[in-house]
């Protein structure tokens, strides 16, 4: 399998009024501070983009883990929460992944999410760097 590099250009004011554009044109949007941080909240923000990337990658890792174990899932969903926190050392991130897996019992669902957390590149990149909580529910 080949490597892949995403290239995104960010211009303007960054997270507060900036614009992002991928080199292939598939991603093109403006950024705004959320209302909770005193911004207009009228555009996406880096935390939402990170949550979308991690959540989609994590579900792919869950599907891979299920396939490797010959487990059939009837549904997969994740609500990914990325929190921008401000502490003594400045700004940081915290994450919560709320995973729902259908067609399996709770023990299997938990085992699959634990395996996915070892497979997913976003999980690997954040491991030991930010607090991460994974809540798994069999549905």
Language model feature labels by segment:
Residues 1-55, 59-139:
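Extended beta-strand/beta-hairpin segments
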């Amino acid at each position: 399998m080949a490597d892949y590099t995403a290239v995104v250009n960010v211009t303007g004011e960054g997270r507060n009024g900036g614009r992002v554009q991928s080199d292939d044109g598939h991603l093109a949007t403006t950024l705004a501070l959320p209302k909770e941080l005193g911004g207009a909240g009228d555009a996406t923000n880096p935390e939402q983009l990170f949550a979308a990337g991690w959540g989609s990658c994590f579900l792919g890792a869950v599907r891979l883990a299920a396939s490797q174990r010959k487990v059939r899932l009837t549904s997969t969903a994740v609500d990914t929460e990325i929190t921008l926190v401000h502490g003594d050392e400045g700004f940081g991130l915290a994450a919560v992944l709320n995973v729902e897996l259908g067609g399996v019992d709770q023990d299997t669902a938990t085992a699959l999410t634990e395996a996915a957390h070892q497979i997913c590149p976003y999980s690997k990149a954040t491991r030991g760097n930010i607090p991460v909580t994974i809540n798994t529910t069999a549905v």
